[in-house]
């Protein structure tokens, strides 16, 4: 998902813990780069190459600096070649950034021509983060079962949030209490995700929540640690990273001790042919029902696929977005009351909230989209790998194996695309009233969820969950930074990825509930 992103802010602390490891291998990496230059996949697409500082500097410098300087080179390339294409040099390969003028001819091409899963695998160093690319089962399940079911799932989500707000927030009736907003949002989303994805039997078990959240963190930690290294070093570094080794152990535990037994139990009950048995109505069961091959149906494969979709496409990304939204409200408190007024109007009774009520939260929807415009998951989107030589309408040849993308960040901050792009306007998309103005809508001017047939399929579910959490939070709590915190915490940049800095405490206190 799109979508798909890097790192928890808390990774910064973990990176420090593993600093000794990193410095040793950083030195080794530089040595290898300088003396044995074997860069990862290079593309021979005939487009300008954007280098850091000067076009005359060796490409190796741009590769080494990409992780810390990516936004500057991405914006530089966009400013010069936004109507054509340009090339970026990453430590582990090349990216060809295409203009949105190619969007219409590319967006509907099949996976046999432009493969999104393979691009995701590459962008998230999938060989070391347990990403599966052997089928579209999870995407099919989202599109055919999850998204159409959102309306009837809302009461379950609300029920789980009622419980989650009780157990995850501190007692703060009489005074402001500090919380780590990202960690709280992470557990809220993880609880909701577990209720919908694995059902009632396991969703509130702390062993599941801990295992799935730790798994999520280790995925993004592994990505953050591996990205600075050239691709040819990944087999060495990836296999000795503590976070990568932890991932392997956690995956085995979840497969064999948690999800595997649950899947086998369900299949045993189905085999009995008991007329009183009702299949669980959750994502895991939907995948079991839709799996077409023996490989897709294997309990370990189902478990790994479910973990991937929940950790990367639901839990982490939603928690990051919620943290960004809260920070934006803290530094722009003038938007809090309009949001509360809308919530009180549209959600008169919290437990009776419907999908229609949530769709009517137009100001909130616009705020979510504007927050995402300023704090996208990454500067690049629409990642695809070209599966066979492809010639575009203007004659540009994309050889087989080329990794293409589009500059979603610069596009959404371009004054030719967005009026007054440097101004945060919470009502921007309420005023637009066009088909692409909704938070989950995609188009050439707003690509943070991707574009075309493989745009983030889980965005509809994530949007509903985020709106419910934000509605409950704004109705129930007052909140502020510490007195000495006067500015929004700066985002962290990991290559082209953008994550919130969650080292800043937030102080909350109960207020008279309005819903």
Curated annotation (Swiss-Prot):
It comes from Penicillium janthinellum. Its EC number is 1.-.-.-. Keywords: Glycoprotein, Iron, Membrane, Metal-binding, Monooxygenase, Oxidoreductase, Transmembrane, Transmembrane helix. Cytochrome P450 monooxygenase; part of the gene cluster that mediates the biosynthesis of the indole diterpenes janthitremanes such as shearinine K or shearinine A. The geranylgeranyl diphosphate (GGPP) synthase janG catalyzes the first step in janthitremane biosynthesis via conversion of farnesyl pyrophosphate and isopentyl pyrophosphate into geranylgeranyl pyrophosphate (GGPP). Condensation of indole-3-glycerol phosphate with GGPP by the prenyl transferase janC then forms 3-geranylgeranylindole (3-GGI). It comes from the Eukaryota. It is a single-pass membrane protein. The chain crosses the membrane at residues 20-36. This is Cytochrome P450 monooxygenase janP. Its cofactor is heme. Disruption phenotype: Abolishes the production of the janthitremanes shearinine A, F or K as well as of 13-desoxypaxilline. GO terms for cellular component: membrane. GO terms for molecular function: heme binding; iron ion binding; monooxygenase activity; oxidoreductase activity, acting on paired donors, with incorporation or reduction of molecular oxygen. The keyword Translocase does not apply. It is an enzyme of class 1 (oxidoreductase). CDD domains: CYP503A1-like (cd11041). GO terms for biological process: mycotoxin biosynthetic process. Belongs to the cytochrome P450 family. Glycans are attached at residue 501. It is found in: Membrane. Pathway: Secondary metabolite biosynthesis. Heme binds at residue 456. InterPro entries: Cyt_P450 (IPR001128), Cyt_P450_E_grp-IV (IPR002403), Cyt_P450_sf (IPR036396). Disulfide bonds: none annotated.
